[in-house]
């Protein structure tokens, strides 16, 4: 029984989640030959109503998958992949995240285009969301709790991003009329 749990944990390790995401984005990048065709094409799929996320047990136990309802419009959970974004925006964002994972995050202040202040991510936003994990007394920090919280978050985000990359790849194939490529 221990062997099954170990294999299951390895299958759902952070490294494997990152590799699945990077592989999905590489596949998307190789499939999308003309990215400009993605402009003004909405990325909508009927099966996106339920997102799949991965839970890490608080005691380090095996992971379990669960389905959660999709975030409501305007909620913080759906901000990166807002319905108003087109396939090209998703394509650029997914490639950017892949590059950040592979090469590290460059700390360059980026100047947003004029009039695009709404809906942009700011570094302080993550600090607001994590403020409940910070303790007033440094000795009271629960590093294990923080680790599991962030690990759960990484697994959830990587699962959703991988799914988005796969959906974008399939939608591109449909848009150009090659829905049976690679099958």
Swiss-Prot record:
Location of the region described as Disordered in the Swiss-Prot/TrEMBL record: 51-77
Record keywords, A-Z: Acetylation, Cytoplasm, Cytoskeleton, Lipid biosynthesis, Lipid metabolism, Microtubule, Nucleus, Phosphoprotein
Main location as per UniProt: nucleus
GO molecular function, one term: identical protein binding
N-acetylmethionine modification, residue list: 1
InterPro entries, sorted: Lipogen_MT_Stabilize_sf (IPR053719), Spot_14 (IPR009786)
Pfam families: Spot_14 (PF07084)
Superkingdom assignment: Eukaryota
Subunit organization: Homodimer in the absence of THRSP. Heterodimer with THRSP. The homodimer interacts with ACACA and ACACB. Promotes polymerization of Acetyl-CoA carboxylase to form complexes that contain MID1IP1 and ACACA and/or ACACB. Interaction with THRSP interferes with ACACA binding.
Family stated for the protein in its record: Belongs to the SPOT14 family.
Described purpose of this protein according to its UniProt entry: Plays a role in the regulation of lipogenesis in liver. Up-regulates ACACA enzyme activity. Required for efficient lipid biosynthesis, including triacylglycerol, diacylglycerol and phospholipid. Involved in stabilization of microtubules.
Official protein name in the record: Mid1-interacting protein 1
Source organism (scientific name): Rattus norvegicus
């Amino acid at each position: 029984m221990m062997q099954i749990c170990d294999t299951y944990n390895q299958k759902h390790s952070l490294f494997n989640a990152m590799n699945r995401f990077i592989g999905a984005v590489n596949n998307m990048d190789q499939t999308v030959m003309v990215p400009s065709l993605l402009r003004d094409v909405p990325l909508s799929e009927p099966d996106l109503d339920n997102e799949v996320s991965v839970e890490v047990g608080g005691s380090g136990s095996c992971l379990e998958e669960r389905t959660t309802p999709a975030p409501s419009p305007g909620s913080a959970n759906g901000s990166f992949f807002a319905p108003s974004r087109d396939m090209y925006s998703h394509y650029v964002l997914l490639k950017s995240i892949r590059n950040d994972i592979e090469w590290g995050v460059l700390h360059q202040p980026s100047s947003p285009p004029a009039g695009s202040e709404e809906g942009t991510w700011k570094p302080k936003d993550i600090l607001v969301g994590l403020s409940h994990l910070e303790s007033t007394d440094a000795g009271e920090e629960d590093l294990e709790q923080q680790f599991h919280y962030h690990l759960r978050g990484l697994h959830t985000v990587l699962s959703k991003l991988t799914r988005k990359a796969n959906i974008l790849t399939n939608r591109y194939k449909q848009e150009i009329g090659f829905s049976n490529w690679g099958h």
